[in-house]
């Protein structure tokens, strides 16, 4: 509306703090001065996806003042520093129809809150960049900051690439390839830019500092516009948004919302001596990873059984039914009980899959032991032995049994 002024989105600030904590930002060091002081600025440039001619962003006092991300890579651990992360209003979306002499502008996402993470130049290969992007995707979801759905553009990646001759200390001129929406695109765009820039340097040509796009069909980057330096954006404080102090209370509230993070789960799966590759598949799905963690909290002995089902049969069931595991009746208590029945010999591995498939639906009543008996899934045994098995399973999970009897799933 004409004359409308911007208003800071409180929820965006809260979610940015949650992700900032997951990125390793040290907010505690600002506590003695009352908290972290942040402000907003105008970034001035002309482009069709920015109708106002400027973007509200943060220049020198961002909401995430730094941090670092550590993740497994090629048998070791890779560390990438976080320069900063700042809140800003998103720009529109440009699309370039193949073979046409025009572009289309979609402004539906314009001015929606965006947190831009700026990384240190710590990556040395396209594969490292891809692994780092995957870990950022994990952290965005585990922190509760975003569902980070790549298909819908809820998380996008800009890849900065420069090359330099062996032995040269200074970085070369960089390009920025914008708005990549898949991990594969991150890797392929970086590979293409490296090849392109090496050819230029080896032929004595200069690499232009520019913003580039990614053509998925051709698997090539293409020039979009020259890349400005910071002073060319003519930053100045946003007059319509007052500065803000991120107080220790706000930080404490954000910490309460951030639960387990990927490296916490890596430590747990490593302690349980689980295969690293399968553990990474589990960790890539926060809902499944949380179920695994809670299952192991109930019964540590079920770590391997729970992992096997969550990265195996569960994936098939989720695809077949369209039901996410967290919406099914396969709770940690159910998974632990089924695992105990398998370990105790009363249930075969094949029948355990059938039993868990029975529970892979909303609001399934009864305990696994009761369902197994009703469906004749238990190993053949006389009635006395069967009663002992059922009693042992129920006694081992007395609280879970009480919850079922009370009607709680």
Write out the residue ranges for each language-model feature.
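Short acidic alpha-helix initiation/capping motifs at coil-to-helix transition points
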Residues: 256-273, 283-288, 329-334, 346-347, ...
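Strongly charged, low-complexity linkers/loops
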Residues: 326-336, 346-409
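Basic, nucleic-acid-interacting segments
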Residues: 1-260, 266, 270, 276, ...
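Short coil/turn segments at secondary-structure boundaries
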Residues: 29-33, 203-210, 268-272, 278-283, ...
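Amphipathic alpha-helical core segments of compact helical bundles
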Residues: 195, 311-319, 340, 357-361, ...
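Generic recognition of stable, solvent-exposed alpha-helical segments in well-folded globular domains
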Residues: 11-15, 128-131, 185-189, 260, ...
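Core structural elements
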Residues: 153-165, 270-293, 301-321, 333-335, ...
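Short amphipathic beta-strand starts and helix->beta connectors
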Residues: 98-103, 321, 396-399
């Amino acid at each position: 509306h004409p004359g409308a002024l911007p208003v800071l989105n409180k929820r965006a600030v809260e979610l940015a703090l949650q992700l900032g904590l997951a990125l390793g930002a040290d907010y505690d060091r600002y506590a003695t001065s009352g908290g972290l002081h942040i402000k907003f600025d105008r970034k001035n440039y002309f482009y069709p996806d920015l109708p106002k001619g400027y973007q509200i962003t943060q220049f020198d006092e961002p909401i995430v003042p730094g941090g670092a991300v550590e993740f497994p890579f090629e048998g070791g651990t890779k560390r990438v520093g976080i320069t900063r992360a700042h809140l800003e209003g998103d720009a529109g979306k440009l699309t370039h129809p193949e073979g046409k002499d025009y572009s289309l502008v979609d402004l539906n996402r314009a001015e929606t809150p965006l947190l831009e993470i700026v990384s240190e130049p710590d990556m040395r290969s396209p594969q490292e960049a891809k692994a780092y992007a995957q870990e950022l995707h994990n952290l965005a979801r585990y922190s509760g900051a975003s569902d980070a759905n790549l298909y819908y553009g809820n998380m996008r990646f800009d890849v900065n690439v420069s090359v330099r001759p062996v032995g040269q200390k200074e970085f070369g001129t960089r390009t920025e390839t914008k708005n990549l929406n898949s991990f594969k695109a991150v890797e392929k765009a970086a590979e293409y830019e490296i090849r392109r820039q090496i050819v230029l340097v080896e032929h004595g040509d200069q690499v232009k500092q520019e913003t580039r796009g990614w053509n998925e069909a051709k698997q090539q980057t293409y020039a979009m516009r020259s890349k400005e330096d910071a002073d060319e954006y003519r930053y100045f404080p946003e007059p319509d948004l007052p500065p803000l102090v991120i107080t220790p209370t706000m930080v404490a509230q954000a910490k309460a919302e951030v639960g387990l993070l990927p490296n916490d789960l890596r430590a747990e799966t490593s302690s349980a001596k689980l295969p690293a590759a399968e553990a990474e598949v589990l960790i890539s799905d926060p809902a499944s990873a949380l179920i695994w963690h809670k299952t192991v909290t109930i019964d540590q002995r079920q770590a391997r059984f729970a992992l096997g089902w969550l990265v195996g049969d569960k994936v098939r069931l989720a695809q077949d039914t369209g039901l996410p595991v967290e919406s099914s009746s396969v709770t940690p208590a159910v998974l632990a009980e089924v695992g105990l029945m398998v370990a105790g010999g009363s249930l075969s591995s094949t029948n355990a899959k059938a039993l868990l498939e029975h529970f892979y639906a909303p609001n399934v009543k009864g305990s696994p032991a009761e369902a197994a008996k009703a469906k004749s899934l238990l190993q053949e045994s006389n009635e006395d032995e069967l009663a002992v098995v059922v009693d042992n399973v129920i006694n081992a999970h007395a609280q879970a049994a009480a919850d079922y009897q009370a009607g709680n799933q």
